[in-house]
Amino acid sequence: MIDLAALWWWKEYQLDHSQDEIIIAAASIYEMDPALIKAVIWRESRFNPNARGVAGELGLMQIRDVAANEWAKSAGITNFHHENLINAKSNVLAGTWYLKKAISRHQHTDDPVVYGLAEYNAGRSNVLKWNSEDAATNSASFIEAIEFPTTKNYIISIKKRREKYRDFK
């Protein structure tokens, strides 16, 4: 008889590694940490390339129209449609590009990833609202200033999951 715990572990292992090739390629192209990308995918879709969010987000990294169109334009892709984001490769490329853009805006801080994740989750306007006084450069103060519990949890869960994936390359 198969041990149920072993079966559960095996299924989780397979799911955790189902998009590795795409993640590594996107990380290389955009010079990002593959463990971070993988952690975002885990949080956003649990590795389901067909995931659909309530606000129109699609795919592994739950990309919305505006971000997808910005990425397509920057990549020189013409005739891009939001539904193309069901394609795992396009989705991870777009999401990684967008996350890199968000993180790069916060290089003056002690932890640009925290600010970038907040922007990825809650939008730039909210990050700018929370980004005052100490919170402008201190990530611990910034997290305290975040008004949405879901965004705080989002950042914390991704940072923890990133550590789990730290040896992933």
Predicted regions and their residues:
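Catalytic-center loop of serine/cysteine hydrolases
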Residues: D110
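Cell-wall polysaccharide-cleaving catalytic domain and substrate-binding groove, primarily
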Residues: W42-A67, G123, K160
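Substrate-binding/active-site groove segments that recognize
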Residues: A55-T78, A94-Y98, T137
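Short glycine/serine- and small hydrophobic-enriched flexible loop segments
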Residues: W42, W97-S104
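A short secondary-structure junction motif
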Residues: F47, A67-A75, V127-W130, D134, ...
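Second-shell loop/turn segments in exported
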Residues: W9-Y13, I23-A27, P49-L58, I77-K89, ...
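Export/targeting segments at the very N-terminus of extracytoplasmic proteins
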Residues: M1-P49, A72, K89, Q107, ...
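Catalytic and substrate-binding regions of cell-wall glycan-acting enzymes that process beta-1,4-linked
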Residues: V114-K169
